[in-house]
Amino acid sequence: MNHLQLKKLLNHFFLEDIGTGDLTSQSIFGEQSCEAEIVAKSEGIFAGAAIIKEGFSLLDENVQSILHKKDGDMLHKGEVIAELHGPAAALLSGERVVLNLIQRLSGIATMTREAVRCLDDEQIKICDTRKTTPGLRMLEKYAVRAGGGYNHRFGLYDGIMIKDNHIAACGSILEACKKARQAAGHMVNIEVEIETEEQLREAIAAGADVIMFDNCPPDTVRHFAKLTPANIKTEASGGITLESLPAFKGTGVNYISLGFLTHSVKSLDISMDVTLSNESVEECCYVNS
């Protein structure tokens, strides 16, 4: 996790929600302090420790946090994830942004852990894709790692992937790879997306570093993996669901990339319970929304 980027993101998210100030919290709490607990309301895998630690302290440096869970830990209903102490206005102002983020990231980590469990193949790495929420890619990919998965390229800038439209524009896989290599240099990996055995053989001849078997059934993936030289990495992707994932066990590919890890997840249920002068904030007044 890049903490400079994290702080930049959190500042943006807090400004979106708080704007020129939290009218409710500022008018009611003033300088009063409170205690808070972030609590799991459902089972899953936790992701977002840095968000809790960095988030509230950005709003007020006097906020103290004690984390009882680390990224990748199993959460059970009712377990305390973190304890917080500090100005009530800061904790209540930051509550919704922090909860929104850790709920979503924990949902992604939970889905990733389930995908790893369903595949049950230590030789194949479960990877994410670029099908992430705009503005949240760094965080969502961090959550995939917390769940036991691996990251595919972060963007169009850190890896070359030659797809059908690129091949059509160049006339062949060989020509597309040649142009990409000349432009990017030898330090950047080139991945080629293929669907047929003929395309596979052309990608091998073109010197691809990684070959993706796109929308291929398990038997085809197994066959293509056997045809691919050991020095070339292989990846299966496209149309793979949690239900179909076990059929890819033992196919011999190095990676399986799954869009649903980030685009179709359900957020984990996590709440923040606040007490003020031995009395629940909710008993004093309604402040959550």
UniProtKB/Swiss-Prot annotation:
Question: What GO terms fall under cellular component here?
Answer: cytoplasm
Task: Describe what upregulates or represses it.
Answer: By heat shock, salt stress, oxidative stress, glucose limitation and oxygen limitation.
Span of the secretion signal? none
What Gene Ontology terms describe what this protein does at the molecular function level? nicotinate-nucleotide diphosphorylase (carboxylating) activity
Entry binding sites for substrate: 96, 129-131, 153, 163, 193, 214, 237-239, 258-260
The biological pathway it contributes to is: Cofactor biosynthesis; NAD(+) biosynthesis; nicotinate D-ribonucleotide from quinolinate: step 1/1
Keywords assigned: Glycosyltransferase, Pyridine nucleotide biosynthesis, Stress response, Transferase
Q: Which Gene3D superfamilies match?
A: Aldolase class I, Quinolinate phosphoribosyl transferase, N-terminal domain
- Give the catalytic activity: nicotinate beta-D-ribonucleotide + CO2 + diphosphate = quinolinate + 5-phospho-alpha-D-ribose 1-diphosphate + 2 H(+)
The UniProt record lists the EC number as 2.4.2.19
From what superkingdom does this record's organism come?
Answer: Bacteria
Claim: GTP-binding is one of the keywords in the record: no
Q: Which GO terms describe its biological process?
A: NAD biosynthetic process; quinolinate catabolic process
Which CDD domains does the UniProt record give?
QPRTase (cd01572)
Q: What class of enzyme is it?
A: transferase
Subunit structure comment from the entry? Hexamer formed by 3 homodimers.
As for what it does, the entry says: Involved in the catabolism of quinolinic acid (QA).
State the NCBIfam families in the record: nadC
Q: Say which family it is in.
A: Belongs to the NadC/ModD family.
The protein in question is named: Probable nicotinate-nucleotide pyrophosphorylase [carboxylating]
Query: What is the phylogenetic placement of the source species in the record?
Result: Bacteria, Bacillati, Bacillota, Bacilli, Bacillales
